[in-house]
């Protein structure tokens, strides 16, 4: 009888679905609605979905039961996917994302650095296929605001070709090559 061990790269069945997207649950909150007859308990879930190649989406779901809330959040995340320009598993340049009181600073990192980021940001980077990045959360630590601030920052990432076209210069002038 052999003992099977689970490596860090092995995906759980609920993490990879048939469509090839990676899913991560960021947070689940128990919420209460107070009515005349008492309290109604429910759950709110925040999830992120990515393809491992630069696309990522976030979704929120609410329900009276956790699995339904998570499923609703996953479905919304799949519908709200956005594409981010990556280079060798990291960003092209440093960027700051903002949402509400949350600010997120993201900086490209050299090969072998890994993902140095806190909870909600780490989940986003793992599902979208970023392997080397330095990120810091400034201000609010609310997971919803951090996820939105991270996506705001990622939407600001531009390739050297995009910057060159905007400035009317060649790519070599922009990259300094």
Swiss-Prot record:
It comes from the Bacteria. GO terms for molecular function: rRNA binding; structural constituent of ribosome. The keyword Magnesium does not apply. Keywords: Ribonucleoprotein, Ribosomal protein, RNA-binding, rRNA-binding. Residues 21-84 form the S5 DRBM domain. InterPro entries: Ribosomal_Su5_D2-typ_SF (IPR020568), Ribosomal_uS5 (IPR000851), Ribosomal_uS5_bac-type (IPR005712), Ribosomal_uS5_C (IPR005324), Ribosomal_uS5_N (IPR013810), Ribosomal_uS5_N_CS (IPR018192), Ribsml_uS5_D2-typ_fold_subgr (IPR014721). One of its GO terms (cellular component) is small ribosomal subunit. One of its GO terms (biological process) is translation. Coiled coil: none annotated. The N-terminal domain interacts with the head of the 30S subunit; the C-terminal domain interacts with the body and contacts protein S4. The interaction surface between S4 and S5 is involved in control of translational fidelity. Part of the 30S ribosomal subunit. Contacts proteins S4 and S8. NCBIfam families: rpsE_bact. Belongs to the universal ribosomal protein uS5 family. With S4 and S12 plays an important role in translational accuracy. Located at the back of the 30S subunit body where it stabilizes the conformation of the head with respect to the body. This is Small ribosomal subunit protein uS5. It comes from Nitrosomonas europaea (strain ATCC 19718 / CIP 103999 / KCTC 2705 / NBRC 14298). The lineage of its organism: Bacteria, Pseudomonadati, Pseudomonadota, Betaproteobacteria, Nitrosomonadales.
